[in-house]
């Protein structure tokens, strides 16, 4: 009897260690699959991403003398950029974007379930409203937590993508590459310059990621059932719809933060995100908050792909169900 008790006691730490190792292994796979899917999809959508940023920030570029006249639309922006800078320039800033997006998306996917468990809401026990709110909160918290670590890369990506050949300096660019963005910004504005627009970014990421993950997790078990369960196209379309809705809802905040980013290194800066929004509304009208939103919707295809591919790979490799 004593022997059995001793054996049972001795086996307890082993079982605990095994459980811990399994959890760590799952966390690692979540991290890697989310990151790889994100990197591939963002590279595929890089030309759309750059066009979106050029249209969104064109007024700041004109004020700084880096753009001669406004773009007439998505198609004209594509054509003009390719003609003036070459087709390869449509991927300008993509390296910084991949470096930023890999840890951001990977951390979002990896920590999403952990944040969800922290809220501890169950649909059957706590009701649909609390369960839905928990999904929104967990998605938002995951996005906001990772933003702090990668914001400077997002800033660098934005500056590189909007670094069109100068309209006043014979085609000269402002930055020579990723490292040059950091060097020049830090020299002119200090660390603060790399984090300009961080405030509205935090609010925007909570709104976007909260809806992005929260609504997808909530709608998945309702929509993707019966013949649609495990269907790649259905999963892709659901992800695209969620991405589009989330992007439109948070787009004005995205415009404000990127317009603030564009003033680092410039003589005139916005005193706050509120002041930035006020000036855009007064000088350019409400429509300016949504400049580039059309390209952003097209870019949403990449986000939908990340969600659906992630689900399919997990289902194939680990048998994880919706």
UniProtKB/Swiss-Prot annotation:
This is ADP,ATP carrier protein. GO terms for biological process: mitochondrial ADP transmembrane transport; mitochondrial ATP transmembrane transport. It catalyses: ADP(in) + ATP(out) = ADP(out) + ATP(in). The keyword Repeat applies. Keywords: Antiport, Membrane, Mitochondrion, Mitochondrion inner membrane, Repeat, Transmembrane, Transmembrane helix, Transport. The chain crosses the membrane at residues 27-54, 95-119, 128-148, 198-219, 233-253, 293-313. ADP binds at residues 100, 112, 257. One of its GO terms (cellular component) is mitochondrial inner membrane. Monomer. PROSITE patterns: SOLCAR. A motif (Nucleotide carrier signature motif) lies at residues 257-262. SUPFAM superfamilies: Mitochondrial carrier. It comes from the Eukaryota. One of its GO terms (molecular function) is ATP:ADP antiporter activity. Residues 257-262 are annotated as: Important for transport activity. InterPro entries: ADT_euk_type (IPR002113), Mit_carrier (IPR002067), Mitochondrial_sb/sol_carrier (IPR018108), Mt_carrier_dom_sf (IPR023395). Gene3D superfamilies: Mitochondrial carrier domain. It comes from Schizosaccharomyces pombe (strain 972 / ATCC 24843) (Fission yeast). The gene is anc1. The matrix-open state (m-state) is inhibited by the membrane-permeable bongkrekic acid (BKA). The cytoplasmic-open state (c-state) is inhibited by the membrane-impermeable toxic inhibitor carboxyatractyloside (CATR).
């Amino acid at each position: 009897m004593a022997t059995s008790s001793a054996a049972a006691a001795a086996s307890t730490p082993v079982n605990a260690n095994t459980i811990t190792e399994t959890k760590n292994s799952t966390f690692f796979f979540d991290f890697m699959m989310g990151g790889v899917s994100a990197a591939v999809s963002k590279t595929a959508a890089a030309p759309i991403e750059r066009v979106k940023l050029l249209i969104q920030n064109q007024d700041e570029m004109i004020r700084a003398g880096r753009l001669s006249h406004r773009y007439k639309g998505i198609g004209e922006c594509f054509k003009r950029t390719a003609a003036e800078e070459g087709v390869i320039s449509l991927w300008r800033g993509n390296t910084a974007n991949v470096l930023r997006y890999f840890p951001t998306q990977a951390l979002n996917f990896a920590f999403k379930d952990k944040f969800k468990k922290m809220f501890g809401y169950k649909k059957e026990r706590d009701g649909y409203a609390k369960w839905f709110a928990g999904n929104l909160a967990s998605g938002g918290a995951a996005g906001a937590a990772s933003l702090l670590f990668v914001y400077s890369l997002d800033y660098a990506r934005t500056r590189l993508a909007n670094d069109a050949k100068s309209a006043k300096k014979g085609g000269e660019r402002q930055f020579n590459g990723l490292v040059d963005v950091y060097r020049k910004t830090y020299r002119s504005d200090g660390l603060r310059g790399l984090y300009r627009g961080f405030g509205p970014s935090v609010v925007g990421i909570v709104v976007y990621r909260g809806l992005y993950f929260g609504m997808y997790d909530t709608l998945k078990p309702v929509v993707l059932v019966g013949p649609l369960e495990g269907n790649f196209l259905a999963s892709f379309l659901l992800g695209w719809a969620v991405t589009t809705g989330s992007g439109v809802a948070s787009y004005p905040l995205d415009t404000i933060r990127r317009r603030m980013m564009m003033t680092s290194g410039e003589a005139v800066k916005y005193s706050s995100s509120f002041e930035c929004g006020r000036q855009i509304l007064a000088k350019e009208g409400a429509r300016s908050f949504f400049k580039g939103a059309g390209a952003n919707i097209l870019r949403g295809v990449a986000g939908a792909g990340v969600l659906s591919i992630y689900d399919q790979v997990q289902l194939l490799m680990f048998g994880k169900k919706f």
